[in-house]
Amino acid sequence: MKQLLDFLPLLVFFAVYKFFDIYAATGALIVATLIQLIATYALYKKIEKMHLITFALVASFGTATLIFHDDAFIKWKVTIVYALFAIALIAGQFLGKPILKSMLGQEMPVDDKIWARLTWYWVLFFVACGLINIYVAFSLSQETWVNFKVFGLTAATLVNTLLTVVYLFKHLPEDKKKELK
């Protein structure tokens, strides 16, 4: 259910874009992201910080897109979100509180050097996605950008997550590997 809620705004954005335009899709994205927050709180009695930050960015950049009737704002939002993810990972690493380890460390007890490698891997991934988004958003058609945002970035993130799990599994202690099989 949680994963469905996470994809709800993206699916709504895509569907509304296909039937209307980028401005209707942006308005729908703002509403869907707000509904996501409310539903998440209703179901789980808490809202993750990242969801609040994402909503703030969607609401502000989406509103700017609608007020100025300029899709550049919503296109930049994607790159800014990826930049914030990368900055958060770097900050956590330098402050001695690796974010990936805090999220997955109990289930995947691997050495700190593995967590550090994964952190930098994800930082590079987020930076690459942000830069590629800029290229696609401002060099190719709007429709190409929407498809890239919805399918390309989602697929890249899923593949990256799978590669991360495989890498972590490879470095797990043998007893933990048996437990997970």
Curated annotation (Swiss-Prot):
One Pfam family cited in the UniProt record for this chain: IspA
Chief place where the protein resides: membrane
Residue runs in coiled coils: none
CC per GO annotation: plasma membrane
Keyword Nucleotidyltransferase in record: no
Keywords linked to the UniProt accession: Cell inner membrane, Cell membrane, Membrane, Transmembrane, Transmembrane helix
Function statement: Plays a role in cell envelope biogenesis, maintenance of cell envelope integrity and membrane homeostasis.
Annotated protein name in UniProt: Inner membrane-spanning protein YciB
Organism: Shewanella amazonensis (strain ATCC BAA-1098 / SB2B)
Taxonomic placement: Bacteria, Pseudomonadati, Pseudomonadota, Gammaproteobacteria, Alteromonadales
